[in-house]
C-alpha cells in the first residue's frame, strides 16, 4: 500500500529488530478475530500488547492504558482498518506535526534516510497532493473538458463560473482551462467544424476569439475610417485656407473701419466741446443750445455746493420748460456781463429757485451783498402773471403777522397745520415775497416792489437778449450769495424746514 500524499511510493518492512514477531502477532490476531469473532480478536490483541503499543504511540503514554482497556472492553480491535499494518503508523507520525519535530520518524526510517529529505516534510514547495500545484493535462482531465465541449458545441465559451468548476474538477488552473478551450476552438475552426457563431475579438477576459477574416475586415474598416477622417480634415483645412483667410481679413478691415469711425466720432465730439468752451469763455455764458450736455453736470455738481440740510430735506426741483434752441448771440452782447466779478461756481452753475433754500435761509444774515440798491433791471422782464395786487400783498402780510414762527411765510401753501388764507380770491403763492422782510432777499428795495422780488426768484423762461440774460444772472448771483450764508444754530430751523417740506409734498 502506498501513501502518495506523504511521499511514500512503496512500503518496506521497517520493524525494529527487538520486536520481530509484532507483525506475526498482529496478523494472527486479525485472522483469529476474523474466524472466531470479535472477542477472541480483542483478547489476542490485548494479550499480545500490539494494540497498547499502537495506542501508546498514537495517543501518548498517559492515555495508553485507558485507550487499551476501552478497546478491549468494546471489542473494536477486529474492526480497526489495516490491522495487519498497525505497527507502521507510529513511524509515519502525525500528519500536521511541525516539520522540525525530532520524534516523528521511526528509527529505521532515520537509519534508511540519514539526512532529512524534502519529500518527508508535509509543507514542501510542491507536495504531491497539493491541489494548488500546477498539473499537466492528462487524458482524464481532458476527457472532462471534451465532454463539456461536446455538450456546448453551439457556444464553446465557458463563463467564469464554469471555468472555475472545471478547474476544480480537473485539478487544473483557470489559465490552463482557458488555454485548452481556446486551442480546442482554434482546432475545430481549422477542421471546419465550427458550429457556433463567431464572437468579437475580445471577450470578458480580453482574449481574441474572432476569426481571422473578421479581424482582417475590422482592420480594414478601421483603416477606411481613419482615411475618411484624414480626408475630412484636409478638406476643412483647405476651406480655411481658401475662405477663412479672406473672411478674417474682411473682419479685420471692418473692425479697423469701425475703430476709425469711433475715433473720428470721439475726436469730433471733443472738438465740438472744446469749441463750445472756447466760445463760452471762462464764465460759461453760452446759449442754451450749447449747454444741453451740461445740465446733468450742473444738477450733480450743484448738489455738492448745497448745504447738508438742504440735501437731506429738499425735494427734487420741478423741471423748467426750456425754449427751443436760439441762434447764438454775437459776442458783443456779452460785454456788460464780462467785468462783473463773481465766484466761478455761482456763474458756471446758476441754480433754480428752490423752496429748500428759502426755507433754510437765515432771517438775519450777517451782511447783505453790496450794490443791490433799487430794483434790478430784470424786474421788467417778469411775466404778467406774477404781477401782484397790493391787496393780496396786504392779506399775506396780515397772515404772516398772525404766526410768529418762520412758517408764517407760507400761509397759502399749507392749509392743514397753519391758518388758512382770508376769505376772497386765493392769492398767488409768491405773494409772500411782498410781505417778506427786506433782508430776506438781500435787496433793500424788495419790500416796496413785489414784482421785482418775484422776478428775482423766478428764472426768466425765455430771455430776449444777452443783456436781459446777464441781468437775470446777476440777480441770481446775489440771491445765491444770501442763500448760502451760515445758518445760526437754532433748534427750530431744521424742524421748521422739515415741516414745510412735508406739507408741500403732501399738498
Swiss-Prot record:
Composition skew (Low complexity), residue ranges: 436-460
Alphabetical keyword list: Developmental protein, DNA-binding, Homeobox, Nucleus, Phosphoprotein, Repressor, Transcription, Transcription regulation
Subcellular location: Nucleus
GO biological process: atrioventricular bundle cell differentiation; energy homeostasis; His-Purkinje system cell differentiation; kidney development; mesoderm development; metanephros development; negative regulation of neuron differentiation; negative regulation of transcription by RNA polymerase II
Pfam families linked to this entry: Homeobox_KN
Compositional bias annotation for Gly residues: 22-39
Cleaved signal peptide residues: none
Matching CDD domains: homeodomain (cd00086)
Modified residues (Phosphoserine): 326, 329
Chief place where the protein resides: nucleus
One Gene Ontology cellular component annotation held by this UniProt entry: nucleus
Alphabetized Gene3D superfamilies for the sequence: Homeodomain-like (1.10.10.60)
Region (Disordered): 19-39, 193-398, 416-468
DNA-binding region: 130-192
InterPro entries xref list: HD, Homeobox_CS, Homeodomain-like_sf, Iroquois_homeo, KN_HD
Membership in a protein family: Belongs to the TALE/IRO homeobox family.
Main function: Transcription factor involved in SHH-dependent neural patterning. Together with NKX2-2 and NKX6-1 acts to restrict the generation of motor neurons to the appropriate region of the neural tube. Belongs to the class I proteins of neuronal progenitor factors, which are repressed by SHH signals. Involved in the transcriptional repression of MNX1 in non-motor neuron cells. Acts as a regulator of energy metabolism.
Descriptive protein name: Iroquois-class homeodomain protein IRX-3
Organism (species): Mus musculus (Mouse)
Taxonomic lineage from the root: Eukaryota, Metazoa, Chordata, Craniata, Vertebrata
Gene designation per UniProt: Irx3
